[in-house]
């Protein structure tokens, strides 16, 4: 019997990835893909179609962010006609709300965030880490429940940081290990496969970055 999988994907390249000035023009969730991102999504659709070619039932979840929804809409037509697909726009996996971010205040906020630790920092006008972890934990429980009852493959279109936090929650990583990993690139993905005992294994580790963890330098 095929073991159910969870495939977590990051959206294709968006204007946010190439121009931070976009925050002076658009709300974060309204930021669209670039032309390069559209092509990335088409290429990724072919990859995902191959991964899912033998999957009878697939459930897709996407963040409400425009860049996530656009990526998914480009991917879906690439799938096999034999795939039975359900799609849900899921607020539980939306990007953490940083509050009022502008090109002027972003560098200072980012510096303070890394100094405090990305899982400890509180945005002055944004969403708390506890709130984000709480909703991602609820999402984990939701998809675990689905795979417990039905042999669905689940595909998640998330954001870079939230992708990593969701993996931390599922895999039980400690904070220091989590902080040692970098975010995945656009249209990168990881596959979690359920074992016979209900545990999940990761097909490929995340790449560790070479930068010191600022929070640990402060604590030493």
What are these regions (language model features)?
Residues 70-71, 161-163:
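Hydrophobic mid-domain F-helix/FG-region of cytochrome P450s
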Residues 12, 160-161:
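Active-site metal-binding loops of divalent metal-dependent hydrolases
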Residues 6, 58, 149-160:
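Generic beta-sheet signal
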Residues 2-85, 127, 136:
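Active-site-proximal alpha-helix that buttresses catalytic centers in soluble enzyme cores
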Residues 1-5, 44, 50, 81, ...:
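Acidic, low-complexity terminal tails and accessory targeting/binding regions
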């Amino acid at each position: 019997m095929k073991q159910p999988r969870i495939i977590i994907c990051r959206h294709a390249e968006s204007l946010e990835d190439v121009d931070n000035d976009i925050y002076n023009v658009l709300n974060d969730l309204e930021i669209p893909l670039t032309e390069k991102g559209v092509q990335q999504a088409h290429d990724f659709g072919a990859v995902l179609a191959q991964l899912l070619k033998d999957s009878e039932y697939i459930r897709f979840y996407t963040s409400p962010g425009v860049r996530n929804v656009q990526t998914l809409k480009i991917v879906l037509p690439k799938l096999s006609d034999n795939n039975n697909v359900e799609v849900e726009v899921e607020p539980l996996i939306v990007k953490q709300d940083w509050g009022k971010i502008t090109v002027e205040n972003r560098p200072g906020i980012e510096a303070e965030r890394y100094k405090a630790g990305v899982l400890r920092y509180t945005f002055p006008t944004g969403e708390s880490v506890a709130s984000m972890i709480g909703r991602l934990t609820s999402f984990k429980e939701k998809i675990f429940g689905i795979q417990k009852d039905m042999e669905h493959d689940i595909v998640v279109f998330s954001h870079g940081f939230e992708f990593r936090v969701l993996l931390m929650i599922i895999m039980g990583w400690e904070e220091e290990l989590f902080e040692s990993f970098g975010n995945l690139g656009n249209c990168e993905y990881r596959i979690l496969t359920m074992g016979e005992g209900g545990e999940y294994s990761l097909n490929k580790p995340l790449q560790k970055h070479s930068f010191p963890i600022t929070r640990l330098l402060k604590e030493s």
